[in-house]
UniProtKB/Swiss-Prot annotation:
Protein known as: Chromosomal replication initiator protein DnaA
Location within or outside the cell: Cytoplasm
Region Domain II, residue ranges: 73-117
GO MF, any single term: ATP binding
Region (Domain IV, binds dsDNA): 335-459
UniProt entry keywords in alphabetical sequence: ATP-binding, Cytoplasm, DNA replication, DNA-binding, Lipid-binding, Nucleotide-binding
SMART domains: AAA, Bac_DnaA_C
UniProt function note: Plays an essential role in the initiation and regulation of chromosomal replication. ATP-DnaA binds to the origin of replication (oriC) to initiate formation of the DNA replication initiation complex once per cell cycle. Binds the DnaA box (a 9 base pair repeat at the origin) and separates the double-stranded (ds)DNA. Forms a right-handed helical filament on oriC DNA; dsDNA binds to the exterior of the filament while single-stranded (ss)DNA is stabiized in the filament's interior.
Domain notes: Domain I is involved in oligomerization and binding regulators, domain II is flexibile and of varying length in different bacteria, domain III forms the AAA+ region, while domain IV binds dsDNA.
Biological source species: Nostoc punctiforme (strain ATCC 29133 / PCC 73102)
UniProt xrefs under CDD domains: AAA, Bac_DnaA_C
Region Domain III, AAA+ region, annotated ranges: 118-334
Region (Domain I, interacts with DnaA modulators): 1-73
GO BP field: DNA replication initiation; regulation of DNA replication
Length: 459
């Protein structure tokens, strides 16, 4: 016999109130409600998209475990937003399942056959804010999406980290897939292309590798600058590019620098990359940054006073990723501590990056090593001792914050760690410090020391 939904959710709340900290429970769990249990799936409502995304990312497994303990069997969890409308339909890909057994998934949930690969649903043209800094890149991307393989082939998107290159590339993919659901649209990072090539060589399956990539109708390749020094990968990519281009298939490439500035890039590849259109994306101006924040707030159903928007936009000028990250930190901080959204209240959690000077990796390593009483060799080593691992994770986070180094380069500074290790460390520290005042204070103190070191080195 099924438990009434009110009783089930009440028991879930009792369990989670014990497991989670009070600010976390009050902010993210207590504000949600259970809508219904249908087809072995629990539908949960949240007050806004930000809360939904936060629960989905950090607490969905905790909720699922609690429900499973109460009911005695695993259930799917579907999180939606309270908008006054009944949830009449949800798809399998929107439901999180604790059980990996396919037989436990309700047959009534439809299966989807996606032709695209690794495309983020948020990266569409309608969510891209156009400004003077990216107008040409946006127009070219839209033209390519509407008529692939024609005027701009290849399209080479060039710009610094976090300026919207990946957004535009994936928007092209989404646009083409909507028009042509049967098209083969491949989005791949240069690192993934290289890894696939290495796997093909190891498994003696080069023919399958070539057939796979050369069957694309649209090939979207991110971070092409990582072809640097990879001679055999450059060789294979050259022939893949030629095959697609000669067949009239669209190729879109993104890089943090123009083709002629990528070290050790083969001249013939540089020539091919330059034969279409190179569209440069610059840093957004103040008006564009404010528009980006306003758009992000509207998408997440967040009310932002104009002075808060202007404060964040004025202090975070480097790139969009940094800008949106500042907004997320501010909203999380305000939500957790139950404060009104004002400039005064968000200032403690937002250290204006414009007051910082670019720090050297060596300076960051030294500051972190001194603070945690470990050696730089410890930070670069492979020790899993708790205190060393913690210091290493904080070091990676700070290096991400205080330098423009890519994730692989940061990994190299820490003794050749994989970029996925850097991502994990940065995500972990970001998640923890938003609800931990002690950690937030430690990070601010370390940042101050890094900034002081940078100033002394400059003077």
């Amino acid at each position: 016999m099924e438990i009434p939904i009110e009783s089930l959710w009440s028991q879930v709340l009792e369990r989670l109130q014990v497991e989670l900290s009070r600010p976390t429970f009050e902010t993210w769990i207590k504000t949600a409600s259970a809508e219904r249990l249908e087809n072995n799936c629990l539908v949960i409502r949240t007050p806004n998209p930000f809360a939904r995304n936060w629960l989905q990312k950090y607490y969905i497994n905790t909720i699922a475990h609690a429900v499973q303990d109460i009911l005695g069997h695993p259930v799917g969890i579907y999180i939606t937003v309270a908008q006054g409308d009944e949830v009449s339909h949800f798809s399998e890909r929107e439901v999180s399942w604790e059980s990996t057994n396919p037989s436990s998934i309700p047959e009534s949930l439809p299966h989807h056959n996606h032709k695209t690969t690794e495309l983020n649903s948020k990266y569409v043209f309608s969510r891209f804010v156009v400004g003077a800094n990216n107008r040409m890149a946006h127009a070219a991307s839209l033209a390519v999406a509407e008529s692939p393989g024609k005027e701009f082939n290849p399209l080479f998107l060039c710009g610094g980290v976090g300026l919207g290159k990946t957004h535009l590339m994936q928007a092209i993919g989404h646009y083409r897939w909507k028009i042509c659901p049967d098209c083969k649209i491949f989005y791949v990072s240069t690192e993934q292309f290289t890894n696939d090539l290495i796997t093909a060589i190891r498994k003696d399956s080069m023919q399958s590798f070539r057939e796979h990539y050369r069957a694309a109708d649209v090939l979207l390749v991110d971070d092409i600058q990582f072809l640097e020094g990879k001679e055999y990968t450059q060789e294979e990519f050259f022939y893949t590019f030629n095959t697609l281009h000669e067949a009239g298939k669209q190729v879109v490439i993104a890089s943090d620098r123009p083709p002629n500035q990528i070290p050790s890039l083969q001249e013939r590849l540089c020539s091919r990359f330059s034969m279409g259109l190179i569209a440069d994306i610059q840093k957004p101006d103040l008006e564009t940054r404010m528009a980006i924040l306003q758009k992000k707030a509207e998408d997440e159903n967040i009310r932002l006073p104009r002075d808060v928007i202007e404060y964040i936009a004025s202090n975070y000028t480097s790139n969009i990723r940094e800008l949106e990250g500042a907004l997320i930190r501010a909203v999380a901080y305000i939500s957790i501590w139950g404060l009104p959204m004002t400039v005064e209240n968000i200032t403690p959690v937002l250290e204006p990056p414009n007051e910082k000077m670019a720090a050297s990796p060596e300076a960051i390593l030294k500051v972190v090593a001194d603070n945690f009483d470990v050696s730089i060799d410890d930070l670069k080593g492979n020790s899993r001792r708790r205190e060393i691992s913690w210091a290493r994770q904080i070091g990676m986070y700070l290096m991400r914050q205080h330098t423009s180094l890519s994730l692989p380069r940061i990994g190299e500074e820490f003794g050749g760690k994989d970029h996925t290790t850097v991502i994990y460390s940065c995500d972990k520290i970001t998640q923890l410090h938003q609800g931990d005042r002690t950690l937030a204070q430690t990070l601010r103190q370390l940042s101050d020391r890094i900034n002081m070191t940078s100033r002394s080195q400059k003077s």
